[in-house]
């Protein structure tokens, strides 16, 4: 039923786009301005109160109703993430042995409206890294609320959970500007409190990353066997899942939580788990199986010699391994 509704919505969206493309341009700016100038004073007052432009909807009652739902949904961050997803292939499992949907879309960047400025050559920062940043947080009217230089572990959310996720992927020296939706303004500090009823603007500059163990985007391949319209997992959130690690050179299974009969319960960014786990989980929608091909060195944990999954001594660090993550349950 969910797939059918998704298909209907996508068809209606495409249908309306085609109608707009082939229909005469009766709503050009000049016509709109002329019509507006002839409106009554009551209409002008109403327009001044509501700054959003009026959208004329065509079609039958059902088409207009669906169009209104789509427009209202796109006004929310979750709604935008929803449509970012359904405009990719419709969610549905494919052959579990044939991972053909390569992950290219970063839903986290869409969710936080991230804009990157400048460049750097050290990084990128992953969930679990210790970073030093300079940040500024303002309200949506650009009134400065907080600014500081702070060192913390990504995922610990000492300032704002959304800030941690904006920093993910940054290089040292880069700057980013973003908008943090209200629900991600939470933190684990008793000294910093933000009203979770409002969105916030963030500017951040990355000054340093420790340790300098990095997962390079061009050295890792990530595939999903299913795509769905949900808000993705974020750095600092908790999730349960099954994991399987296979050595590609000979097919030897190095770890399998399902065979052990116990799911992994992990906070994304936990430095006692392999770095590649946090890298692969951040931004993942909790359906299907995510398959990751990466070098063994990325399976090291950031926290000294502690690795809850596989000992560093037994890791083939210079070989490629296959990591499979599935059976997700968000805590």
From Swiss-Prot:
GO biological process: one example: protein folding
A Pfam family annotated for this UniProt entry: FKBP_C
Record keyword Transferase present: no
Gene3D superfamilies the UniProt entry points to: 3.10.50.40
GO molecular function: peptidyl-prolyl cis-trans isomerase activity
Disulfide bridge partners, by residue number: none
Key words, A-Z: Isomerase, Rotamase
Ranges where the PPIase FKBP-type domain occurs: 128-226
EC annotation from Swiss-Prot or TrEMBL: 5.2.1.8
PROSITE patterns recorded: FKBP_PPIASE
Enzyme class: isomerase
Residues covered by region (Disordered): 28-50
Keyword match Isomerase: yes
Protein name: Putative peptidyl-prolyl cis-trans isomerase RF_0616
Organism: Rickettsia felis (strain ATCC VR-1525 / URRWXCal2)
């Amino acid at each position: 039923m969910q797939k059918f509704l998704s298909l209907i919505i996508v068809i209606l969206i495409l249908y309306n786009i085609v109608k707009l493309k082939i229909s005469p341009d009766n709503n050009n700016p000049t016509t709109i301005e002329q019509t507006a100038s002839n409106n009554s004073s009551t209409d002008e007052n109403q327009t001044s109160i509501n700054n959003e432009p009026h959208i004329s909807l065509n079609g039958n009652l059902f088409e207009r109703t669906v169009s209104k739902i789509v427009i209202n949904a796109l006004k929310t961050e979750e709604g935008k993430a929803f449509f970012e997803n359904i405009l990719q292939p419709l969610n549905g499992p494919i052959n579990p042995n044939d991972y053909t949907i390569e992950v290219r879309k970063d839903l986290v960047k869409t969710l936080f409206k991230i804009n990157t400025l400048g460049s750097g050559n050290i990084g990128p920062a992953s969930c679990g890294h210790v970073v030093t940043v300079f940040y500024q947080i303002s309200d949506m009217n650009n009134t400065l609320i907080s600014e500081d230089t702070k060192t913390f572990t990504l995922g610990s959310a000492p300032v704002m959970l959304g800030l941690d996720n904006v920093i993910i992927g940054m290089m040292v020296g880069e700057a980013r500007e973003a908008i943090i939706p209200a629900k991600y303004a939470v933190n684990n500090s008793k000294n910093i409190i933000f009203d979770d009823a409002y969105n916030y603007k963030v500017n951040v500059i990355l000054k340093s990353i420790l340790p300098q163990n990095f997962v390079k985007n061009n050295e890792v391949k990530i595939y999903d066997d299913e795509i769905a319209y949900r808000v993705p997992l974020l750095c600092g959130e908790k999730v349960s899942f099954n994991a399987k690690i296979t050595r590609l050179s000979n097919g030897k299974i190095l770890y399998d939580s399902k065979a052990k009969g116990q799911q992994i319960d992990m906070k994304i960014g936990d430095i006692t788990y392999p770095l590649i786990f946090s890298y692969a989980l951040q931004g993942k929608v909790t359906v299907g199986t995510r398959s990751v091909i990466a070098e063994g060195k990325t399976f090291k944990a950031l926290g000294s010699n502690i690795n809850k999954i596989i000992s560093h001594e037994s890791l083939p660090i210079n070989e490629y391994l296959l990591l499979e993550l599935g059976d997700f349950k968000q805590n």
